[in-house]
UniProtKB/Swiss-Prot annotation:
Catalysed reactions, semicolon-separated: dCTP + H2O + H(+) = dUTP + NH4(+)
Residues reported in the UniProt entry to bind dCTP: 107-112, 131-133, 152, 166, 176
Stated family: Belongs to the dCTP deaminase family.
SUPFAM superfamilies with a match to the protein in the record: dUTPase-like
Broad EC category: hydrolase
Pathway the protein takes part in: Pyrimidine metabolism; dUMP biosynthesis; dUMP from dCTP (dUTP route): step 1/2
Protein name: dCTP deaminase
Residues at the catalytic site: 133
EC number: 3.5.4.13
A Pfam match: DCD
Quaternary state and interactors: Homotrimer.
Gene Ontology molecular functions: dCTP deaminase activity; nucleotide binding
Keywords: Hydrolase, Nucleotide metabolism, Nucleotide-binding
Taxonomic path: Bacteria, Pseudomonadati, Acidobacteriota, Terriglobia, Terriglobales
UniProt organism field: Koribacter versatilis (strain Ellin345)
Length: 184
């Protein structure tokens, strides 16, 4: 399994619609960078956010998650409360090939401010907008900028095609369109 270069990512985006919309160079001027990089793609966060609040619940239960645990906003910025988190989605829609797995890593600009991004791998043949988990590890409110870079996706291509893909097993987050809460 090898990490894929900018040439491969560009070709797959242009010929197979793997990333849409796709920026074939890194946009950096006056923004938190996004677009194609040497060995990855920096995705952007959309202007839709769900900010966690504990007003309605005393416990977080992934098997019985209450949508009322979030305040939904649409804005150019999201203020994540101290020691809390928000959910968001990517601007880009991804279609992952059957022989590819992705890993997401946070951007250093946010990490140096105590903001951590968590995204599980995009499995072979998964497609959709990415639901992003943004944690504020600081004791102060943290600002997230919509339509700017949030994290980097690294693409790994296997030397053989998987037996069962995410699409084959009818994964519960397949073709997600917006911010999707936990499902069982």
């Amino acid at each position: 399994m090898a990490i894929k270069s900018d040439r491969w990512i560009r070709r797959m985006a242009q010929e197979h619609d793997m990333i849409n919309p796709f920026y074939e160079k890194q946009m950096r001027q006056g923004v938190i960078s996004y677009g194609l990089s040497s060995y990855g793609y920096d995705l952007r966060v959309a202007d839709e956010f769900k900010i966690f609040t504990n007003v309605n619940n005393a416990i977080v239960d992934p098997k019985h998650f209450d949508e009322k645990s979030f305040v939904t906003i649409t804005s150019d910025v999201c203020i994540v409360p101290p020691n809390s988190f928000a959910l968001a989605r990517s601007v880009e829609y991804f279609k992952i090939p059957r022989d590819v797995l992705t890993i997401c890593v946070g951007k250093s600009t946010y990490a140096r401010c105590g903001i951590i991004v968590n995204v599980t791998p995009f499995e072979p043949e998964w497609e959709g907008y990415v639901t992003l988990e943004i944690s504020n590890t600081t004791p102060l409110p943290a600002k997230i900028y919509a339509n700017e870079g949030l994290c980097q996706i690294l693409f790994f291509q296997s030397d053989e095609v998987c037996e069962i893909s995410y699409k084959d097993k009818k994964g519960k987050y397949q073709s997600q369109k917006g911010i999707v809460l936990p499902k069982l």
